[in-house]
Amino acid sequence: MSQKNTEQPVPSAQALTPLPGRRALLASALAAVGGFALGWLAPRQRGAELPAGTADLGAADLGAADLGALYHQWSKPGHGPALGAAPDWGRQPPRTKTYPAVARIPLPDPSGWQALSLEQTIAARRSVRNYTTQSLTLDDLSRLLHAAQGLTEPRRGFRAAPSAGALYPIELYPLVRDVTGLEPGLYHYAAQEHALELVQAGDFRTGVMQAGLGQSVLGQAAVCFVLSAIFQRTRFKYHERAYRYVLLEAGHVGQNLCLAATGLGLGACTVGAFDDDDLNELLGLDGQEEAALYIIAVGNRTS
């Protein structure tokens, strides 16, 4: 059995240059989400070495580095906490999130699509930023949510998007502006029941646009889908690699949603530029155990 080469590539010089303003944010985020203390990482497996050029980095040096590059290196297999003990990764949290005290609205059967073929859908997908004033139908909203991460094999709990370990850390919050038969407001998608939970009624256009740095597409959309993650669902099992897997899954869910919108003749636009704290506050999330990752605006496209 051949022995693996454990030498790791050296981060670029640019990756180790100061990035003012991001030090505190990235350090706290990676420490909380990654579940380990940056700067105190060392090999867990015999023969493994820290990435060249990073072994001597301490907590005081983090502000002088691209923490994304360091996290990528340190989350490779074989690199974990020093001090002789692994961090406490915690226990597995509940697999689903519900709002038991709010109104629950069953969604229509999502089957029976009259949509483009998969080949046509992939070829036609574009980022669409302008929408008509036409309402989105409840049937289409049901299909979008089911395509994003609805149950596809209920007996085993499998969903439409792949998930590391089938742990499903991603939550979906539709901010509904104009859907036939639905009150405007903040909703939560209960995938197990294929239903919506009305978290708070009201017009969220101003709030989501402010959080989204003034992007007009967020105010025009019939629905803005916000994807969040409950990190512990993945962290307890996959440890320092959990954050990688969570972000990958957000991409899977987002692409499902975009392709479903395109196949239904709708327009969709993905948005990654937003103020995290403002968006988390808008949704009522703490930004630590659960945090917003992604916004996808959907509406009836202009011709």
Indicate residue ranges for each PLM-predicted region:
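N-terminal Sec-pathway targeting helices
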Residues: 18-28
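Small-aliphatic-rich amphipathic alpha-helix that forms the alpha element of a beta-alpha
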Residues: 125, 144, 172, 221-227, ...
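N-terminal secretory signal peptides
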Residues: 1-20
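N-terminal amphipathic, basic helical "cap/leader" segment at the start of enzyme domains
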Residues: 2-5, 27-220
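A glycine-rich helix N-cap at a beta->alpha junction
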Residues: 285-303
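Beta-rich nucleic-acid/ligand-interaction surfaces
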Residues: 160-165, 275-284
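Conserved hydrophobic/aromatic beta-strand scaffold that supports enzyme active sites
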Residues: 186-188, 224-226, 295-297
